[in-house]
Amino acid sequence: MSRTASITRTTSETSIELMLDLDGTGNTDIATGIGFFDHMLTALGRHAMLDLIVRAEGDLHIDAHHTVEDVGIVLGQAIREALGDKRGITRFGFAATPMDEALCEAAIDLSGRGFLVFDVPFERPMLGDMDTQLVQEFFQALTANGGFALHLTRRAGHNAHHVAEAAFKAAARALRMAVEPDPRAAGAIPSTKGVL
């Protein structure tokens, strides 16, 4: 069964087209108009082993907020759609990912309930053309629309670029683990409730 999704979302603020393959090889083609965000989405796709195509046009003359948040919304929707009823998945994932002096941890539960615990402070306000506050906004939109819990924590680091990249890579590696098929639970819903 193909675990893919293709979603288009257009509002008065943004226009987004996204294609996702959960069983990809990490091939990405990202264009949001926000250089640093493109870099982070590329890292997310590569380390989650997702094939990911994103085309986004937004009201960048205001700022990057709507574009970053709306890409999170659409990517979350795509992950949820591609997972289907979640039969046979591992469900939980965890990763601790360093980048030089920075270290971030991520834990994911594909529970069907969107929840974010975000403890990733930044020591400067901007990453290129992206406000550091938008990192949390992205993950908030992603988890709410993806229907999964994510705990994301900075354990060490002071370079804002390194911290952000470690956070995205940790989330990616945890997601990769969680969506992987569990050979011991083929066809089973990984929940005592029988539904996720």
From Swiss-Prot:
This is Imidazoleglycerol-phosphate dehydratase. One of its GO terms (biological process) is L-histidine biosynthetic process. GO terms for cellular component: cytoplasm. It is found in: Cytoplasm. PANTHER family: IMIDAZOLEGLYCEROL-PHOSPHATE DEHYDRATASE (PTHR23133:SF2), IMIDAZOLEGLYCEROL-PHOSPHATE DEHYDRATASE HIS7 (PTHR23133). It is an enzyme of class 4 (lyase). Its EC number is 4.2.1.19. GO terms for molecular function: imidazoleglycerol-phosphate dehydratase activity. Belongs to the imidazoleglycerol-phosphate dehydratase family. InterPro entries: IGPD_sf, ImidazoleglycerolP_deHydtase, ImidazoleglycerP_deHydtase_CS, Ribosomal_Su5_D2-typ_SF. Pathway: Amino-acid biosynthesis; L-histidine biosynthesis; L-histidine from 5-phospho-alpha-D-ribose 1-diphosphate: step 6/9. It catalyses: D-erythro-1-(imidazol-4-yl)glycerol 3-phosphate = 3-(imidazol-4-yl)-2-oxopropyl phosphate + H2O. HAMAP family: HisB. Keywords: Amino-acid biosynthesis, Cytoplasm, Histidine biosynthesis, Lyase. SUPFAM superfamilies: Ribosomal protein S5 domain 2-like (SSF54211). Gene3D superfamilies: Imidazole glycerol phosphate dehydratase, domain 1.
